[in-house]
Regions:
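Metal-dependent nucleic-acid phosphoesterase active-site entry motif
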Residues: 1-20
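PIN/NYN-family metal-dependent endoribonuclease catalytic core
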Residues: 6-7, 24-54
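Alpha-helix capping/helix-boundary segments
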Residues: 11-12, 45, 116-117
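Acidic catalytic patch
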Residues: 43-46, 64-88
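Membrane interface segments of multi-pass transport proteins and intramembrane proteases
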Residues: 58-59
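Acidic, metal-coordinating catalytic cores used for nucleic-acid/nucleotide bond scission
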Residues: 86-92, 115-116
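Acidic, metal-associated active-site segment
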Residues: 90-109
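Acidic, PIN/NYN-like endoribonuclease modules and their adjacent C-terminal/linker elements
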Residues: 105-109, 113-155
């Protein structure tokens, strides 16, 4: 089973900043590589990721930045969103919201550390909440949330 999800930039930053592999932000990124999460993106999101991850205050290596961007493009799905007309606290976040709305028929999620920047919806989740959706407990037993995830082989 796989879930579609849009990753807010802050989740990528947190995953690259952490030294621990057991954090929710690190685990949601690992879920891309394992095929449990299919990232949704468009060029505007890739450009934002690239710009923010290159900011000097983070000091991420070019190799780490390119690796995560390649993983998103390689394992992800490009989406051309329709305008929603939604007004958000931070309008720079609108592209993430519009992409998740474009794929809501496929039960897509938006994963963010800034829940308050978005409307309160059950598909806008923190990295920890996404891990609860994917996994039953800390032993790593997979929980298949059929109403939220896609069967294997679904594009």
């Amino acid at each position: 089973m796989r879930c579609y999800a849009v990753f807010d930039t802050n989740v990528l930053i947190s995953s690259l900043l952490t030294k621990r592999t057991d954090t929710a932000t690190a685990r949601v990124i690992d879920a891309i590589a394992s095929g449990d999460i299919v990232p949704l993106y468009n060029q505007k999101i890739i450009d934002e990721y690239n710009e923010v991850l290159h900011r000097g205050k983070f000091s991420f290596s070019e190799e780490r930045i390119q690796k995560i961007l390649l993983m998103i493009r390689q394992f992800g799905l490009a989406v051309n969103p329709s305008p929603t007309g939604e007004i958000l606290v931070d309008m720079d976040d609108l592209v993430f919201y519009e992409i998740v709305m474009e794929k809501r028929d496929d039960d897509a999620y938006l994963i963010t550390g800034n829940i308050r920047h978005f409307p309160k919806r059950d598909f806008i989740v923190t990295p920890s909440e996404m891990m609860e959706i994917l996994y039953r407990d800390s032993s790593g037993q997979e929980r298949i949330a059929r109403q939220f995830c896609l069967p294997d082989g679904h594009p």
